[in-house]
Amino acid sequence: VRARLAPLLLLAACVTTPPPMAGGIHINEPDLDAWSAALQGAGLDTVQVTAYARQAAWDGGEVGFERQDPSEVIVQLEAAQRAGLRVMLVLRTYLEHALPENRHLWHGRIHPRDDQLDAWFANYREYALWGARLAAEYDVDVFVVGNELNSMTSTVFPDEAIDPHEYFLDAERTAKVRDDLVGCADDVVARGDGSDLTHWDGGRFDSLHDQLVDAERARRAWATAVTGAGSRAEIQARLEARGARLDAGWRALIDDVRGVYRGPVTYGANFDQFHRVGFWDALDAVGVTSYFPLTLWGATDEEQRAAMTASWTEVADRLTASATLDEDDVLPVYLLELGWTRLEGSTVRPWSYDRVDVLETVGEVEEGAAQPLTCVHWASQPARPDERVEALAALADLVDSGGFDALRGFSLWKLTTRDYHHEGERFAVLVPADVRDNTPNDSDTALLAQAARLGALLRQSAQRKRRTSRR
């Protein structure tokens, strides 16, 4: 159990309590005032606004935000203010994929070399202070100082939690996954359903096998650079030493941000990495992108509902554990990206929706054995948007029962007032608006109703806590 640092105790009077927030992220809305009105009409109260920085080489110290036009952020902040909506400003970083050395990696793998780490923090500090000044000027309700920087924010390493490094270094394990995927793709093509299974990686590779081999090479090189590829004990020691530097860097940066912006500050950890962030006590809330697996492939409707309840309960317990600083100090939790596609099976691996995958499947499993797998071709999958409605309803039910008292807010990924976004963005949820191209559908309306219900529950919970704290 961690205790808050003394400097943060001194700042407590300056930082407002993280508010309940129920909202989402839009998809290139052309009319922000109409978008804000639509959001309010759906019973939601928060807009998530994003700013972007660019990371050059994954192992370098160059972080730049010169391509981020401040006016693009400001116009969204002003529209939300006009509508009386709450605002969460999120700093995101994208990895420059035009650089060959970054191929097959993502921003969660950003990991500057030891001799570049100080430069990285100096550059990222400028980005964070730029965002903090905007947050202060526009009275943003919550400022998210970074998002999904897995390798840069893993500062604690339980003995059993060295993955993904071990996985990338294990040629036998990566080959097994590769063979499963290639076999799945071959089966799809053999039955005549694989028109989308060509032009791998923009045509750079002739086959999925070649693409996956190249990806394994890149990720193994990344893991070798990060860990030194020594023994487990050597890797553990190396990661812990690096983690100490990262922890100090983030705490100093957060202190600097607080000198500019006096509202609540959090960070957006990935759903599979939040437990490795060791500096939650320096922040005002735990933030997480919420793509947690909730079900298994092939479950009946009854099995699926039971699995959703059990999975959300486990997620709530784990997040609450990370948010617990001491017996009387539990940080609020925000689900910064909460969403599923409209396809059947979207709650098995919410991040998976393209080409082919092999998904964990319902079945009898002996102790110690792996869950059976099923080949899934996403382009052949039928739509089942009610599945995501049920997933959100299960979360709302858990909150209603008192099973996730730490939850303070969520942002749906992604909302739109334009029905044509349904074709290009599988996560899209259509928000009814007074525009001619709007065609509300029952499943999106039902999902928004559950979102509004969850938002109301979170506001009621926050009110109860305020009354209790005044006694």
Q: Which ranges hold each PLM region?
A:
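Boundary/entry segment of secreted carbohydrate-active catalytic domains
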Residues: 15-44, 50
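The substrate-binding groove and active-site-proximal loops of carbohydrate-active enzymes
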Residues: 24-26, 57-70, 109-125, 149, ...
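Short, well-ordered coil/turn segments that N-cap beta-strands
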Residues: 18-23, 43-45, 81-87, 139-141, ...
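Hydrophobic h-region of N-terminal signal peptides that target proteins for export
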Residues: 8-16
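Aromatic-rich peripheral "rim/lid" segments of glycoside hydrolase catalytic domains that contact
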Residues: 162-199, 204-206, 351-352, 377-393, ...
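Substrate-binding cleft and catalytic face of glycoside hydrolase catalytic domains
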Residues: 42-60, 72-214, 220-227, 231, ...
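Short, acidic/polar
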Residues: 27-41, 121-134, 270-277, 389-399
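Glycoside hydrolase catalytic-domain groove-lining segments
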Residues: 70, 75-76, 90, 227-255, ...
